[in-house]
């Protein structure tokens, strides 16, 4: 009996991940305090163990200035002898735009397949990505079919956008150094330097994977999540795209 109860609590009130209140998906409310009360004691202990295990798996790499210069050069940078961000900074000599855009919107989508845009899937593609094909055909649009995914999950992709660095399993959203100052190559830092107000909209919940605190530490002025968006078909992971973009549109109309 004790073993069965232990298994039950291990998965957070169920015998499988899908129906459980797992520590990675228990953040359903906007209050950190209430989210902590939702999480049962065994799952809370399992969370500590999981995060500690991830941190232990990280490697400390010490490079000499010469080795650092060689590695920066190998990925297109010019080592300036001072810092990483400066080694990848480029200053333009000719302005490309006569007028700076009033707003710039970047959509980071998970599991958005390219196949509906391909000619061999023209019939379903014409319906599924009708608007997307119109944008792609615009003379002002650009696209590529040669790209690598930032990572294998949601947080690695978000980390890549926020830090400007490739995913190497370092978990920057949990690293204390990440909260001391923003990464210079992250999208928030770049847009702030260009004079923009930075607003991050997340279709999930803010306390998942520490995403809100991490985002605000990386040069974003505001963070909005699923708890602020009316939705009738939301789930443990957040709201649907329709409700997300509806909330964003209403905000931009203000």
Identify the residue ranges that each predicted region occupies.
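Soluble catalytic regions of membrane-associated enzymes that act on cell-envelope
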Residues: 13-254
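Internal/C-terminal transmembrane anchor helices
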Residues: 2-16
